[in-house]
Design a protein with these regions (language model features):
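Extracellular fibronectin type III
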Residues: 3-24
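Residues that flank catalytic or metal-binding motifs in active/ligand-binding sites
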Residues: 12, 40, 162
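N-terminal carbohydrate-binding/catalytic regions of secreted carbohydrate-active enzymes
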Residues: 51-127
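Low-complexity, Pro/Ser/Thr- and charge-rich linker/hinge segments at domain boundaries
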Residues: 17-40, 44
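Mature N-terminal segment immediately following signal peptide/propeptide cleavage
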Residues: 37-57
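Aromatic-lined, polymer-binding surfaces characteristic
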Residues: 67, 99-179
Length: 179
């Protein structure tokens, strides 16, 4: 309940009844499920058969210009590496918790920046079909995956950020990927 002015007020009791004749949940067999899946990859960001229309409809969108300009600018900037994490202040910290907090904060600066850069390349590729963006995104994502081996790759959400980025790249680059 909610306490207001020293007394507790309760909401009304809500309920539902399960009748014996209600439909039961019965998932389809695996064979039925598989037979209904589309034969092409069900893209999330842009369906492949609607891609050209998406590109032409986005021609005048300010977001398109922003993504392309940012991608062009980022192409000229070398990728930061996780080993570039600023650890210079670690020696002055007196306990493990403080050192871990500093390392987490400093490594997230690099992870966050490169995650955004790779996402910009993915979106710029979807807006243009320019292979330069595809190649740069893949190069950076493949490098970022290697960061898991670094002692500087610290943080609660680094792996989920990489997983999200890889999922986006898989969706966008599906037709270009090989085994």
């Amino acid at each position: 309940g909610y306490v207001e002015g020293g007394s507790t007020s309760w909401s009304e009791v809500l309920k539902f009844t399960q009748e014996p004749h209600q439909d039961r949940f019965s998932p389809p067999s695996f064979k039925t499920f598989i037979s209904k899946l589309p034969s092409r990859h069900p893209r999330v960001l842009v369906a492949s058969d609607e891609w050209d229309t998406f590109i032409s409809q986005s021609e005048d969108a300010p977001e398109r210009a922003w993504y392309i300009a940012r991608a062009e600018k980022t192409l000229k900037v070398p990728m930061k590496h996780i080993d570039d994490t600023d650890t210079s202040k670690m020696a002055g910290l007196d306990n493990e918790v403080k050192r871990n907090a500093l390392l987490t904060r400093e490594s997230r600066r690099i992870v966050d920046k490169e995650e955004v850069n790779a996402e910009v390349f993915v979106r710029a590729y979807l807006l243009t079909k320019d292979d330069r963006y595809y190649k740069e995104a893949m190069k950076r994502i493949l490098e970022m995956i290697k960061w898991e081996e670094s002692p500087n790759f610290v943080g609660d959400f680094n792996e989920s950020a990489l997983l999200s980025l890889c999922s986006m790249a898989y969706d966008a680059f599906y037709d270009k990927l090989d085994a």
